[in-house]
């Protein structure tokens, strides 16, 4: 409960101050350089994936369509927080308006909720492709793909809307200093003058149920996939199937391990996990998957790598010919 009635407009600060990574201020410049390099890599890699898939009609299969959406979500997630982080680390520009802070919180958490759903749909795609190859096109029709994508998005919005409403109706009458590099829910909740436990419990239980159910279904899919793969008579076919799935497993590990570590480190508190470790984990969580996903999929998926290379050559030579 929020307790007694509050005049919300009087208890809303004009802005918050993001402190970056507490205790590592001396390393902020090096962190800014590293984050900038990773962000540029993420933007280029994910944009190339979206473009290569979008422009080639032969790559409109479910796996590539889901990968295209994943790349777009990674761009949104990284772009929601990294530019402001770099600004804080480089120039000390730590101020962020109240509305911008809550918008940032909404989009970064929405993107993470969409991404876990996408990883589940991609696991289902691999399950159908390997365990039911003859029925692949009949099961994963464009209508089914659209329905799955819509369901993932609606679930994420349904999860985030109550959380945003609860946070937006908390009074912030004390300090406006956010001990974090971006407007993460739990860091903002600690500044509230009223009891933040309802929103914090909703966030923890909701995200645990969402991620837990997705991981359970993904694990079940891969158990069935491995059984089907090892039943194949050809070693070459086994290796090809395992190689295709390996990239997906790598992407899942990059997403779930730092994500869950970040969530539970924040809940354990700084008596167990130092505050700078909590913030650094949360920062890396929003940029590392976006940076490495295109590299993993590009290097492990020969067709996609060829498509990206073909698009780059076409882009470079066409422009050089126009220039001459």
Curated annotation (Swiss-Prot):
The alphabetical list of record keywords is:
Cell membrane, Disulfide bond, G-protein coupled receptor, Glycoprotein, Membrane, Olfaction, Receptor, Sensory transduction, Transducer, Transmembrane, Transmembrane helix
Q: Where in the cell is it found?
A: Cell membrane
Upper classification of the source organism reads: Eukaryota, Metazoa, Chordata, Craniata, Vertebrata
Is Metal-binding set as a keyword in this record?
no
Chain ranges on the Cytoplasmic side, renumbered to this chain: 51-58, 125-143, 222-241, 300-324
Disulfide feature: 101-193
InterPro entries named in the record: GPCR_Rhodpsn (IPR000276), GPCR_Rhodpsn_7TM (IPR017452), Olfact_rcpt (IPR000725), OR51/52/56-like (IPR050402)
One annotated GO molecular function: olfactory receptor activity
* The protein, known as: Olfactory receptor 52I1
- Please explain the role this protein plays, according to its UniProt record: Odorant receptor.
Record organism: Homo sapiens
Q: Which residues lie on this side of the membrane: Extracellular?
A: 1-29, 80-103, 165-200, 263-278
Residues bearing attached sugar chains per UniProt = 7
The UniProt entry's coiled-coil ranges are: none
Q: Name one GO cellular component term.
A: plasma membrane
PROSITE patterns named among the record's database cross-references = G_PROTEIN_RECEP_F1_1 (PS00237), G_PROTEIN_RECEP_F1_2 (PS50262)
Membrane spanning stretches: 30-50, 59-79, 104-124, 144-164, 201-221, 242-262, 279-299
Gene field: OR52I1
KW Chaperone (keyword) present:
no
Q: Can you tell me which family this protein belongs to?
A: Belongs to the G-protein coupled receptor 1 family.
